Swiss-Prot record:
<keyword id="KW-0732">Signal</keyword>
<dbReference type="InterPro" id="IPR045087">
    <property type="entry name" value="Cu-oxidase_fam"/>
</dbReference>
<keyword id="KW-0677">Repeat</keyword>
<dbReference type="Pfam" id="PF00394">
    <property type="entry name" value="Cu-oxidase"/>
</dbReference>
<feature type="binding site">
    <location>
        <position position="485"/>
    </location>
    <ligand>
        <name>Cu cation 3</name>
    </ligand>
</feature>
<keyword id="KW-0325">Glycoprotein</keyword>
<feature type="glycosylation site" description="N-linked (GlcNAc...) asparagine">
    <location>
        <position position="405"/>
    </location>
</feature>
<feature type="glycosylation site" description="N-linked (GlcNAc...) asparagine">
    <location>
        <position position="114"/>
    </location>
</feature>
<feature type="binding site">
    <location>
        <position position="133"/>
    </location>
    <ligand>
        <name>Cu cation 3</name>
    </ligand>
</feature>
<dbReference type="Pfam" id="PF07731">
    <property type="entry name" value="Cu-oxidase_2"/>
</dbReference>
<feature type="glycosylation site" description="N-linked (GlcNAc...) asparagine">
    <location>
        <position position="82"/>
    </location>
</feature>
<keyword id="KW-0560">Oxidoreductase</keyword>
<dbReference type="GO" id="GO:0046274">
    <property type="term" value="P:lignin catabolic process"/>
</dbReference>
<feature type="signal peptide">
    <location>
        <begin position="1"/>
        <end position="27"/>
    </location>
</feature>
<dbReference type="InterPro" id="IPR011707">
    <property type="entry name" value="Cu-oxidase-like_N"/>
</dbReference>
<protein>
    <recommendedName>
        <fullName>Putative laccase-9</fullName>
        <ecNumber>1.10.3.2</ecNumber>
    </recommendedName>
</protein>
<feature type="binding site">
    <location>
        <position position="542"/>
    </location>
    <ligand>
        <name>Cu cation 3</name>
    </ligand>
</feature>
Length: 579
């Protein structure tokens, strides 16, 4: 049942209340940004093409704020296609209207139109990011969100001498819209990108790239905070810096116990705050590669994939220790493309900080248990024009994906409006299953090919305050980065093989598990998360491999209003885009 409707005048009043609520006396501010979506020519790998950008920048502008601020972003669509923007990892308390996923919480912003997002920062502190949430547009429409501690507080680690956003991404020589259209027409997988990138540059190992390679100037003895974001569409990535170790101090804008490692593995959608100490041996090399390499779990002979390594250069510039030399040193500790043991060894070491200023509150009593199978499937081809369709699909079908054997179908109007106006009937069904409709054990398809699934717009409705445990159970042969809008969650467990309800919960970490918004579920394995459904609204959950979103590896949580005004969804803004 939807929330009661309020006229525009009451929305204006609610906006005043909202500003007061997020700007109390402790010094939080309202910050304003204008984003202009435009087509801009860029050249990479000797190819020039027109791409969608924000303010002509690729990556887009960085948003700077402090914990608890309100960020107002007016998005002007001067491009040639519909678009929306999502504020990835921002909980948006009571405010799904500004969350951004197309046809989930809003209709897209049409060319020539604009929409003003109210980005409510609450408990987030660290690095997040924003990106387009329509089609494959986020390949070039994305940027960092840097959230500093509240005034009067500081980092729970030594203050860095400098902060550096490091955005990992991908570049296609072809128009990204053509890449998506081709895959949908032919029913096959998406063509792999032509290069991985670091801050939109592939690095000097690629043609026509040497002069523009991203460089980081450092001085001996200084500490640098790298704000690392995986903005890629299709790949997990390993990241390392030659001659240096890295200390992870945060993930998804929540602090972690300091973890010093030789490399990190970061999934699409995830962010990590990493300290780099510039401590090289005197007289040694003064130039070092930072490198980002694809991590893939699929059999390498099954699909085309991007086997590239993006590079940037860390250069010591202080006169006492620096000496120009030949080529930069390469990070020999960077794991191989299919090193699953290295990936698991890294992610299982992450722990929440859990101090007095940043406590851990893991729910110990669970109200709603969900076991969600993740799978790659097929759907029948459109019987019309068979000569052109499904030429590249498996066994004459087209690729699909599912959660609990339901391949999500986006509605013609957004789910949030349908819920708000109590008109969900005919738009969505409230029967997303808590368990798989067809359970497969062992969690592989035994080489017989993908299984047929079914389409549906099924959502899961939760009472306000419900404690939810979701066990993601991966039936496929690749990892899946599962992202939940509107919440951070505790990753209480993970493992290989089939999840055992009688045995595996005993292995959970309920003391200091990492607090994330995106979790990498291991292939043919499982990951368990817990969260409290105390944010009323409509919230998307999906794989952050974008082709899997298009294929249907998604669902929606609807969290009902609580009893008090502070536990109820904000009213609908009067200027929402129309479908």
């Amino acid at each position: 049942m939807g929330t009661a409707k309020l006229p525009a005048l009451l929305w204006l009043l609610a906006g005043v209340v909202l500003a007061l609520a997020v700007n109390p006396a402790h010094g939080a501010k309202t910050r304003h940004y204008d984003f202009f979506i435009t087509e801009t020519n860029y050249t990479r790998l000797c190819h020039e093409k027109s791409i969608l950008t924000v303010n002509g920048q690729f990556p887009g502008p960085t948003i700077y704020a402090r914990k608890g601020d309100l960020v107002i972003v007016n998005v002007h669509n001067n491009g040639n296609k519909n678009i929306t923007i999502h504020w990835h990892g921002v909980d948006q308390p009571r405010n799904p209207w500004s969350d951004g996923p197309e046809f989930i919480t809003q209709c897209p912003i049409r060319p020539g139109g604009n929409f003003t997002y109210q980005v409510i920062l609450s408990e987030e502190e660290g690095t997040l990011w924003w990106h387009a949430h329509s089609d494959f547009d986020r390949a070039t429409v994305h940027g960092a969100i840097v959230i500093h501690p509240k005034r009067g507080t500081t980092f729970p680690f030594k203050k860095p001498d400098k902060e550096i956003p490091v955005i990992l991404g991908e570049w296609w020589n072809d128009d990204i819209e053509h890449v998506l259209d081709k895959a949908q027409l032919l029913g096959g997988d998406v063509d792999p990108s032509n290069a991985n990138t670091i801050n939109a540059q592939p690095g000097d190992m690629f043609p026509c790239s040497r002069d523009d390679t991203f460089k980081v100037a450092v001085q001996q003895g200084n500490t640098y905070l790298l704000r690392i974001i995986n903005a890629g569409l299709t790949n997990d990535m390993f990241f390392a810096i030659a001659g240096h170790r890295l200390t992870v101090v945060g993930i998804d804008a929540r602090y972690t116990k300091p973890l010093t490692v030789d490399y990190i593995m970061i999934a699409p959608g995830q962010t990590m705050d990493v300290l780099l100490e510039a401590k090289r041996t005197l007289g040694s090399n003064s130039r070092y590669y930072m490198a980002a390499r694809t991590f893939i779990t699929l059999p390498l002979d099954t699909i085309p994939f991007n086997n590239s390594t993006a590079t940037a250069i860390v250069e010591y510039t202080d006169s006492v220790t620096a000496r120009p030399v030949g080529p930069p040193e390469f990070p020999v500790q960077l794991p191989a493309i299919k090193d699953e043991n290295a990936a698991m060894a890294f992610v299982t070491q992450l722990r929440s900080l859990g101090n007095q200023e940043h406590p851990v509150h893991v729910p110990t009593h669970v109200d709603e248990h969900m076991l969600i199978d993740i799978d790659i499937n097929v759907l029948p081809c459109d019987p019309t024009n068979m000569a052109e369709k499904c030429k590249e699909g498996p066994q004459g079908n087209r690729f699909a994906a599912s959660l609990n054997n339901v391949s999500f179908q986006s509605p013609a109007i957004d789910v949030l409006d349908a819920y708000y106006y109590s008109s969900g009937h005919g738009v969505y069904e409230e029967d997303f299953p808590n368990k798989p409709t067809a359970f497969v054990d062992p969690p592989v398809n035994n080489g017989s090919g993908p299984l047929m699934t079914k389409r549906g717009t099924k959502v899961k409705v939760l009472e306000y305050g419900t404690v939810v445990e979701v066990v993601f159970h991966d039936l496929s042969s690749e990892n899946h980065p599962m992202h939940l809008h509107g919440f951070a969650f505790y990753v209480v467990g993970r493992g290989n093989g089939t999840f055992d309800e009688s045995r595996d919960p005993a292995t959970y970490n309920l003391v200091d598990p990492p607090f994330q918004n995106t979790v990498s579920v291991p292939r043919s394995g499982w990951a368990a998360i817990r969260f409290r459904a105390d944010n009323p609204g409509v919230w998307f959950m999906h794989c952050h491999f974008d082709r899997h979103v298009v294929w249907g590896m998604d669902t929606v949580f609807i969290v009902k209003d609580g009893k008090t005004p502070q536990a109820q969804m904000l009213p609908r803004p009067p200027n929402m885009p129309q479908c």
